[in-house]
């Protein structure tokens, strides 16, 4: 299992466009990937799940992956979030 914490910096939080980007990135991997915020955990491959969390700017979230490609998944998602200016 691999996980990483992120601090959301994008002004609009994780709304439709960033959520779609994260779901698309997570869907490339076979591992189970979850997004946790305020004690709630959702499947990062589910757009509705991600949007339902209402993650705003300044939020701290944890993304976890479990499976054969967990380390690659977390690494790629972290790179995407940083490159797109979503989190640090």
Swiss-Prot record:
Q: Which domain of life is it from?
A: Bacteria
Q: What is its main location?
A: cytoplasm
| Keywords recorded for this protein, A-Z | Cytoplasm, Phosphoprotein, Phosphotransferase system, Sugar transport, Transcription, Transcription regulation, Transport
Activity regulation: the record says: Phosphorylation on Ser-46 inhibits the phosphoryl transfer from enzyme I to HPr.
Q: What is the effect of changing residue 46 to A?
A: Abolished S-46 phosphorylation
Please give the Gene3D superfamilies that the UniProt record associates with this protein.
HPr-like
Q: Which GO terms describe its cellular component?
A: cytoplasm
Disulphide bonds annotated for this chain are: none
Q: Which residues form the HPr domain?
A: 1-88
Query: Which SUPFAM superfamilies has this protein been placed in?
Result: HPr-like
Which residues belong to the signal peptide in this entry?
none
| Task of the protein | General (non sugar-specific) component of the phosphoenolpyruvate-dependent sugar phosphotransferase system (sugar PTS). This major carbohydrate active-transport system catalyzes the phosphorylation of incoming sugar substrates concomitantly with their translocation across the cell membrane. The phosphoryl group from phosphoenolpyruvate (PEP) is transferred to the phosphoryl carrier protein HPr by enzyme I. Phospho-HPr then transfers it to the PTS EIIA domain. P-Ser-HPr interacts with the catabolite control protein A (CcpA), forming a complex that binds to DNA at the catabolite response elements cre, operator sites preceding a large number of catabolite-regulated genes. Thus, P-Ser-HPr is a corepressor in carbon catabolite repression (CCR), a mechanism that allows bacteria to coordinate and optimize the utilization of available carbon sources. P-Ser-HPr also plays a role in inducer exclusion, in which it probably interacts with several non-PTS permeases and inhibits their transport activity.
Q: Which family does it belong to?
A: Belongs to the HPr family.
Q: What is the protein name stated in its UniProt record?
A: Phosphocarrier protein HPr
């Amino acid at each position: 299992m691999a996980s990483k914490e992120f601090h959301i910096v994008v002004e609009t939080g994780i709304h439709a466009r960033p959520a779609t980007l994260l779901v698309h990135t997570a869907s490339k991997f076979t591992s189970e990937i979850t997004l946790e915020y305020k004690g709630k955990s959702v499947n990062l491959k589910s757009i509705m799940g991600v949007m339902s969390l209402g993650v705003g700017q300044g939020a701290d979230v944890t993304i976890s992956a479990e499976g054969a490609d967990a380390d690659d998944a977390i690494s790629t998602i972290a790179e995407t979030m940083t490159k797109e200016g979503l989190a640090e």
